[in-house]
Amino acid sequence: VGSEMCIRDRTAGILPINVQKSGIDVLCFSGHKGLLGPQGTGGIYVRPELSIRPLKMGGSGIRSYEKEQPAAMPEHLEAGTLNVHGIAGLLGALEYLEKTGIEMIYKRERELMHLFLEKIQGIPGLTLYGTDDLQQRVPTAALNIGSCDSGYVSDWLYENYGIAVRSGAHCAPLMHEALGTREQGAVRFSFSHVLTEEEVRIVAQALREFAEEEMQQ
């Protein structure tokens, strides 16, 4: 019987999960997205009964004269010098999340996303991807303007308004294959709880300005 592995690269710190109820044996997560930690951090949950072979060996510090990693977890998977600065930063982020409240943060981010989706309605040439059910959306929005390359849209927003968005394939090639956007990519907007409603309105207006200029050409 195989093991159940789950990748939570983008939803850790955003959506709740119970590994026992979900029957997950291995859970991998990134630390620099929903958990607000530094880049280069992340973690892995391994069901205690599961045996995993280390990808790398050596430099464990506590077993310097042995070729094999210590049997105990998590040292079993921790070869070499750890990213102590990154781990400290991730700890600080987790403490902030615990103090502020994940539910409060998520609620605020969704409110800002809803405002953005409301303000971009009617933008010429706009294609919004994902479900129309706002309750099923996480606080991101992926879209395109006509046939404009997503990188071009991203550059325009940054150069004219200092707005930073993500363009391209977003490490999701199969999704773009399914959407037919392999060459164009998509422009992704992510909403932080520290944004203001006025900033969201400015972003929506900038996108409208870009679209109206492009559609006139």
PLM features per residue range, with description:
Residues 7-8, 27, 44, 90, ...:
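Buried hydrophobic positions in well-ordered alpha/beta secondary-structure cores of metabolic enzymes
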Residues 85-86, 90-137, 156:
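Conserved PLP-dependent catalytic core of the aminotransferase class-I/II
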Residues 146-150, 197:
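Helix N-cap motif at beta-to-alpha junctions
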Residues 159-160, 164, 176-217:
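PLP-dependent enzyme catalytic core of the Aspartate aminotransferase-like
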